[in-house]
Amino acid sequence: ICIIPWIFLAIGILTKGPVAFIIIFTTLFSFLLTHKNWKKLLVKINLSKGLLITFLISSPWYFIQLIQNGNVFWDNFFGYHNLKRYTSVVNNHAESWWFYLFILILASLPFSIFLIHGIVDTFKELINKSEIRSESSNSIYIFSLCWLISVLLFFSFSATKLPSYWIPAI
């Protein structure tokens, strides 16, 4: 098992909380849907060992915080900084649903046209050619597209929108 991705997931969970977990597993799920041999790929990922590694690295800090601060930590970190920011507008940071599409174009300047071209090409190949679903040479493009769309969709549904929320897509 390659433990490096699981270590980075744990670091993401330590720095950003459950959002890191949600983004990774939304990406992973959508990526698996694009592959004919998704079961074989799932075995290679070794989900149970990976999740155990992630849990062992990230959980001690959360447990210590809960023991030291109790409900204050729970309400502040999970309640306010995760749930409330996602479900309601905080600090007047309301934007329309397409806000991150604009950020996508703006953040990728001056290469926006290449990004859009790559997205469109990958979508076309994914839809039109069934053989792409088993080719490993295209996997990085498909995974990147799944990652980009997962971040874009997740944060587009968020009530509070900040340009910095887009950073995980980069």
Where are the regions a protein language model picked out?
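Membrane-interface transmembrane helices that cradle and orient dolichyl/undecaprenyl
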Residues: 1
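Substrate-binding/catalytic cleft of secreted carbohydrate-active enzymes
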Residues: 4
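Transmembrane-lumen/periplasm boundary regions of multi-pass, lipid-linked membrane glycan transferases
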Residues: 7-8, 15, 20-166
